[in-house]
């Protein structure tokens, strides 16, 4: 897989290789989708990829289901396998946004090694920081439409009809990993692993931090867009 991917990369320059860094639920996915269209990038969300495996009841999905739903971290090798598979399938772009990876220093090192072999090192690391109490309220109020991936919020972006998708009329769900108990577990995991990642990218001079507390999506987006210009 690696040699095939390297050959595909050699045929087209990747202008932007971007890591979106920050705790689960901070808004990385929302911002990534906006920037994806504007810069012809491809968003790779390891969280979405893992949940797709779970929905498909694949061997991998069955193996990681309990880990994801309890707020744990999937092992680094599995995450990197998923990342490479996503890159292999999507090469017609100007670069990638890595959303949800890296989350450990081991993943940082593996990602650097992979991209070095591709000849396409990271160009930007965008760190979205947020007050944890605000984040808890944001995450534990989320509602999802499984078929499309549309996201609502009980308070800030409610559906027109309670627990019902505005477009299809199908029921919305609350993910099992969006309960207060699992949120606390995920935050414990996150804060136990993220500081070495922050330090690593800071020393490389490619880390940019964007506080997002109380800021509208469009305000944050303008700042991120400017950072990638």
Swiss-Prot record:
Region (NMP), start-end ranges: 45-74
Cysteines paired by S-S bonds: none
Pfam families listed in its UniProt record: ADK, ADK_lid
PROSITE patterns with a match to the protein in the record: ADENYLATE_KINASE (PS00113)
Reaction catalyzed: AMP + ATP = 2 ADP
Binding residue positions for ATP: 25-30, 142, 214
Keywords: ATP-binding, Hydrogenosome, Kinase, Nucleotide-binding, Transferase
GO molecular function ontology, one term from the record: ATP binding
Protein name: Adenylate kinase
Prosegment location in residue numbers: 1-9
KW Nucleotide-binding (keyword) present: yes
């Amino acid at each position: 897989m690696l040699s095939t991917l390297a050959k595909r990369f050699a045929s087209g320059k990747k202008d932007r290789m971007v890591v979106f860094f920050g705790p689960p639920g901070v808004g990385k996915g929302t911002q990534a989708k906006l920037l994806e269209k504007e810069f012809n990038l491809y968003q790779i969300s390891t969280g979405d990829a893992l949940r797709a495996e779970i929905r498909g009841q694949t061997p991998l999905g069955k193996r990681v289901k309990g880990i994801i739903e309890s707020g744990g971290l999937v092992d680094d090798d599995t995450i990197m396998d998923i990342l490479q598979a996503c890159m292999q399938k999507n090469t017609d772009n100007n670069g990638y946004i890595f959303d949800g990876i890296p989350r450990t220093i081991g993943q940082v090192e593996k990602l650097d090694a992979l991209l070095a072999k591709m000849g396409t090192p990271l160009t930007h690391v965008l760190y979205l920081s947020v007050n944890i109490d605000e984040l808890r309220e944001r995450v534990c109020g989320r509602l999802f439409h499984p078929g499309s991936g549309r996201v609502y919020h009980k308070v800030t972006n409610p559906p027109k009809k309670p627990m019902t998708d505005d477009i299809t009329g199908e029921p919305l769900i609350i993910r099992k990993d969006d309960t207060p108990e699992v949120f606390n577990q995920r935050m414990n995991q996150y804060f136990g692993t993220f500081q070495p990642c922050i330090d690593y990218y800071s020393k490389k001079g490619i880390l940019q931090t964007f506080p997002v507390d109380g800021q509208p999506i469009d305000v944050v987006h303008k700042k991120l867009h400017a950072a990638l210009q």
